[in-house]
Amino acid sequence: MGGIKEFLKHEASGGILLMIATVAALLCQNTFLSDFYNEFLKTKFTVSFGEYELSKPMILWVNDGLMAVFFFLIGLELKREVLEGELKNPSQIALPAIGAAGGLIVPAVIFYLFTKHDSFALGGWAIPTATDIAFALGILSLLGPRVPTSLKIFLMTLAIVDDLCAIVIIALFYTSELNAQMLAVASVCLAALFALNRLGVKSKAAYLIVGAVMWVAVLKSGVHATLAGVVAAFFIPLSFKDEPGKSMLKSIEHDLHGWVAFGVLPIFAFVNAGISLRGVGLDEILSPVALGTALGLFVGKQIGVFGFSFLAIKFKLAKLPEGSNFIQLYGIALLCGVGFTMSLFVNGLAYNDTDAFAYTDKLAILLGSVVSGAAGFILLKFSAKN
């Protein structure tokens, strides 16, 4: 339980910082600071390795680089949870897994219904399927002990399954033209990581160097670079035969949690949440992409997560989290509609980080997430009083 409590503590307080970063980005984009803010996002940074040079604007360093660290942490959490955590026991994973399935299917269907006549817009079908665990737990932290720990663990486990689905979606649907040479380099790195794991190598630096080379290769291959972080994490040893009490995975996970919660995600929010509200009217807000996104998050997520979970409990496929009731479960389902950073990330992949929809796609993510978060907070607070 200690690892779970630490996870909840970091994610919850990090969620509050995410809110501050979001407000800061909106203020920068919609005040006299807008020119400075946009120039900052376009500022190019170059890293050279002998003949090789990697030059990208700030926003792509964040989206491709820092977010790879975030997905690396997700990979570590997934591996630990599968081997010895909440995902090890099929009975414990049943309800969050079924809820996550509903939270994936229903929002995607809603988005499809609004955008089916526009093939480019339809490419964003996965945007409302995501859940921002940091933001959701940040909202839960404001309720303190009013919410049972079992529900917090349910939300955390559902978000982990949700992240796993996001990884698969990115790999299958948001991969551009492939570079065979770079994929070959990435494969060699993969083999090297496997060898390091099997040989019981205890040097974090060795894994870091091979992982960094693999990240560059994947970045150049056409596969999204964040997937390199996930794959690398799967080869970090959970324990060593000669030192069973020592865990490299848990050590790295512990060290990274703070950096990701208080650094990576707030920075990502700051560079991606700068939505221009100038000229945004009712027509833009009621556009197919905006409606599909906002309603997918607010309506689709709550119906999908709660509906599938309710049926699973009624058909005795799973049990209601200990010490909770259906009203509280519905409140958690509402919080799952807080897609924010993950939805913004998928949005960037779907529409190639362009402003093809004049920021209304991002505005819809913000609106859907805020309404979901507010509704979930109010319902959970009300249910605690009763």
Describe the predicted segments one by one.
Residues E6-H10, L27, S203-V213, A217, ...:
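Predominantly late transmembrane helices and immediately cytosolic-facing juxtamembrane segments
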